[in-house]
């Protein structure tokens, strides 16, 4: 990333904002990122540091001309070897412009210009050096944030202005009248050049550095081998007094086949929180599209194998071993193997409340006898229900989860082999689910839900709250230079 990407928007925060692609009109976002006044203050501080380095690259052209010297007539002068050894930006603010974008306002900037001068008049040859000090420089830049039809972010400069309040010149030489004439020429020429060069440098940097950098942000991010997440913008960022809200689609989808979901994201009523630089409001829509994506991919389907049952229980997937559970099974299908196939009935809806993240999964477990012909014949089907709560944790870039299951409740839905001991089978399934299925799911949750951040951004002072229909993540931000 170029220094300008950090300079103008303090890309530490802009990286939170933009991953474009327009959404459907009238729908709610799945994720909202809110940049607070504290976040904008941090962006301004980071931006000033980087902008100082960028403006030190401003090149000043040589300048020549002629002027009249009393008693000597007209003479030629030239200013050359102009350098900027110091460029200090002392104060700056980054504020939202409602309905437009962002404004970067810099005041009390200071520039030191060092150069040489020479004067020629027939036989007269004079030359020496000078130092020019610009004080009270102000710079104002307005940026428009948006997205293009491809779904990627855009940033343009709508206006830029700079103004020099005071110039002091320290010029070396002996002829006072000549030096006074030179001073007026240097003051006028360099004031004009500096004011135009500063804005030109800024505008070129937006086009050449910041915009290409934003274009590298992917619209989608792969979570794992099964699913990805759509971080497209649903509209241009909303600038209001003291904050900037960015609306992301926030939809998780299966990688092998994406299709529209048949439910909408709920409206989120964000609290008026300002203790952190940035807040992520993640609606239950995000979690429910994740459940749907993994259901469509078949990730929730499972098989109970002999290796999953403790050896000391002496229970294997045979009709003989299942005699304690289903007495008639071994009589009707003597000495045959069993297959136990589990499926989640449908995508599971996650309910976010002020207390917790809750889910109520329902599963079917079907038993099939493997006949001597290798054909499979279904013999009974069980319904399994439970309550699941999730513990969520944060790190510098992602959210992780851990499921805490409740006890299973098993019912017999269908049987071709008569009745059986549901309580005993329920105990066996509780052991299996607790020791095999949930660890598998928790392993997947450990892969983490990535937040919409660009590279080199880290979060700290993390805050996690659950609200009705959404999860609120607050954080401060640090840009780690590389």
Curated annotation (Swiss-Prot):
One of its GO terms (cellular component) is extracellular space. One of its GO terms (molecular function) is signaling receptor binding. One of its GO terms (biological process) is positive regulation of macrophage activation. Glycans are attached at residues 301, 351, 387. Detected in blood plasma (at protein level). It is found in: Secreted. It comes from the Eukaryota. Disulfide bonds join 160-199. Keywords: Antibiotic, Antimicrobial, Disulfide bond, Glycoprotein, Immunity, Innate immunity, Lipid transport, Secreted, Signal, Transport. Pfam families: LBP_BPI_CETP (PF01273), LBP_BPI_CETP_C (PF02886). Residues 1-26 form the signal peptide. Plays a role in the innate immune response. Binds to the lipid A moiety of bacterial lipopolysaccharides (LPS), a glycolipid present in the outer membrane of all Gram-negative bacteria. Acts as an affinity enhancer for CD14, facilitating its association with LPS. Promotes the release of cytokines in response to bacterial lipopolysaccharide. Belongs to the BPI/LBP/Plunc superfamily. BPI/LBP family. When bound to LPS, interacts (via C-terminus) with soluble and membrane-bound CD14. This is Lipopolysaccharide-binding protein. It comes from Oryctolagus cuniculus (Rabbit).
């Amino acid at each position: 990333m170029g220094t300008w990407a950090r300079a103008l928007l303090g890309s530490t925060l802009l990286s939170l904002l933009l991953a474009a692609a327009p959404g459907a009109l009238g729908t709610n976002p799945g994720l909202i990122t809110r940049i607070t006044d504290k976040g904008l203050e941090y962006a301004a501080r980071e931006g000033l540091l980087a902008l100082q380095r960028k403006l030190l690259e401003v090149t000043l052209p040589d300048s020549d001309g002629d002027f009249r010297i009393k008693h000597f007539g007209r003479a030629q002068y030239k200013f050359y070897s102009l350098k900027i050894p110091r460029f200090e930006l002392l104060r700056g603010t980054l504020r939202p412009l409602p309905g437009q974008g962002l404004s970067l306002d810099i005041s009390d900037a200071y520039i030191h210009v060092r150069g040489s001068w020479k004067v020629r008049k027939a036989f007269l040859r004079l030359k020496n050096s000078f130092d020019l000090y610009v004080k009270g420089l102000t710079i104002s830049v307005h940026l428009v944030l948006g997205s293009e039809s491809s779904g990627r972010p855009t940033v343009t400069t709508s206006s830029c202005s700079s103004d020099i309040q005071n110039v002091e010149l320290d010029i070396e030489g002996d002829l006072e009248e000549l030096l006074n004439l030179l001073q007026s020429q240097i003051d006028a020429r360099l004031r004009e050049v500096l004011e135009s060069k500063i804005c030109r440098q800024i505008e070129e940097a937006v086009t050449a550095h910041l915009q290409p950098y934003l274009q590298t942000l992917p619209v989608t991010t792969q979570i794992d081998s099964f699913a990805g997440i759509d971080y497209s913008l649903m509209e241009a960022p909303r600038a209001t007094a003291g904050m900037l809200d960015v609306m992301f689609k926030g939809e998780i989808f299966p990688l092998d086949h994406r299709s529209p979901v048949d439910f909408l994201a709920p409206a989120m009523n964000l609290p008026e929180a300002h203790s952190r630089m940035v807040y992520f409001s993640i609606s239950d829509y995000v979690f429910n599209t994740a459940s749907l994506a993994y259901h469509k991919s078949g990730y929730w389907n499972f098989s109970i194998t002999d290796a999953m049952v403790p050896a000391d229980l002496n229970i294997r997937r045979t009709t003989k071993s299942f005699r304690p559970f289903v007495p008639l099974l071994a009589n009707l299908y003597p000495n045959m193997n069993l297959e136990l196939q589990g499926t989640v009935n449908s995508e599971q809806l996650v309910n976010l409340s002020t207390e917790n993240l809750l889910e109520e999964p329902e599963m079917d477990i079907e038993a099939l006898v493997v006949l001597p012909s290798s054909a499979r014949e279904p013999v009974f089907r069980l319904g399994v229900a439970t309550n699941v709560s999730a513990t969520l944790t944060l790190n510098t870039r992602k959210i992780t989860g851990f499921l805490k299951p409740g006890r299973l409740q098993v019912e017999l839905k269908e049987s071709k082999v008569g009745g059986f001991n549901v309580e005993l089978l329920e105990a066996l399934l509780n052991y299996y689910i607790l020791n095999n299925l949930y660890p598998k799911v928790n392993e997947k949750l450990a892969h983490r839900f990535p937040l919409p951040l660009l590279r080199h951004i880290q979060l700290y002072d993390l805050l996690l709250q659950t609200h009705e229909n959404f999860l609120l993540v607050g954080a401060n931000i640090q840009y780690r230079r590389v």
